[in-house]
């Protein structure tokens, strides 16, 4: 979901573990030379999803990295397969009320219409939960979510050793 804390939490956890962090949207902007809004305006949703999928393939080849994908990554089934083949998928489940109450997100166009964000959550929740290897509930404060994510990452690291 947009605004659920993927990038913020991902950066903190990657830093804590001494790993690299990639925000997939930033990667898309870097590779395309256009911001996300420009890509949507020029290519539409379908065109953006193709670019996003191509960038995900690039990112999936990287090692020892924590990735924050865009919230719509799960709308393309092949993307779920790519993510699961290249690593573990963690869904950060943040209640819509918490997303909407975060004043630092007020500039995001998608979050201006409360009805749309609830609809988006309801449309995607089953995809998020079914594609996730782990679910981190981001209900309380950021520190609690970071602690949960570090526990998840340590489990993953133990499995890989």
Predicted regions and their residues:
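P-loop (Walker A) phosphate-binding loop of NTP-binding proteins
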Residues: 1
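ATP-binding Walker
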Residues: 4
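Walker A/P-loop
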Residues: 7
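NTP-dependent small-molecule kinase module
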Residues: 12, 16, 88, 126-161
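ATP-dependent small-molecule kinase phosphotransfer cores
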Residues: 23-82
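Short, flexible helix/strand-to-coil boundary loops that buttress conserved ligand/catalytic motifs
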Residues: 32, 40, 52, 60, ...
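Short glycine-rich anion-binding loops that position phosphate/pyrophosphate groups of nucleotides
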Residues: 71-73, 95-97, 141
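A glycine- and Lys/Arg-enriched "phosphate-lid" helix/loop adjacent to the NTP-binding pocket
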Residues: 86-127
